[in-house]
């Protein structure tokens, strides 16, 4: 297939995180153009609006008929496809103050419920990411998020995208994850994270990712090497389970199959799309 790849991955977008992200090698990237890799510094934040901007840029400049969007950030993909509202523009200083306000709350979800029951009803109490985003809007606009979105409605994504997902038998997936984790450790995962953790702020977004956060616990002597490996494997299996459930319940017209079936379906779809 004559295609290019857009990486919708919240870890591969960072420079210097190569092992923890299982990023494509430079050789692989030389043969096939990849977008949205090595774009951010460790102390910068990734989010759905950023990925949407990068995706639209890639679609505009790509010289190929097909652009494959690949990755694990299903929540971002859903946000992009459903449409994003314009978010309030705030300075770096304001962002720091807002972050401090939110972090000082004893119960962020309870506070959100008190100022905007409508928004709180749509968010699970354990969904810390969405709770945080809702409170950011409140503190930056002094308006309940539900009211803000009434005057700043979502802008739907203007391109049609076909969706495909791999279905892998549980034991095979677990074995893949175990082998991937072993490979990461053998390739120097701990050394990679040790260097980055010493160089960047401790609250940097990538330091919360699976594979990274467990390595930090090991470096802080809270985990043994054996427990580190077990924790990465267990947390990755749980993440894969959550992603699978999310994909099945949140996307319409999702084609699911084995590696061979999905490959065949994508090839057929790309041929018909090009002809059309």
Curated annotation (Swiss-Prot):
Its EC number is 2.5.1.75. Its cofactor is Mg(2+). GO terms for molecular function: ATP binding; tRNA dimethylallyltransferase activity. Residues 9-12 are annotated as: Interaction with substrate tRNA. Keywords: ATP-binding, Magnesium, Nucleotide-binding, Transferase, tRNA processing. One of its GO terms (biological process) is tRNA modification. The record marks 73 as: Interaction with substrate tRNA. It catalyses: adenosine(37) in tRNA + dimethylallyl diphosphate = N(6)-dimethylallyladenosine(37) in tRNA + diphosphate. It is an enzyme of class 2 (transferase). Belongs to the IPP transferase family. Monomer. Catalyzes the transfer of a dimethylallyl group onto the adenine at position 37 in tRNAs that read codons beginning with uridine, leading to the formation of N6-(dimethylallyl)adenosine (i(6)A). PANTHER family: TRNA DIMETHYLALLYLTRANSFERASE. NCBIfam families: miaA. This is tRNA dimethylallyltransferase. It comes from Helicobacter pylori (strain Shi470).
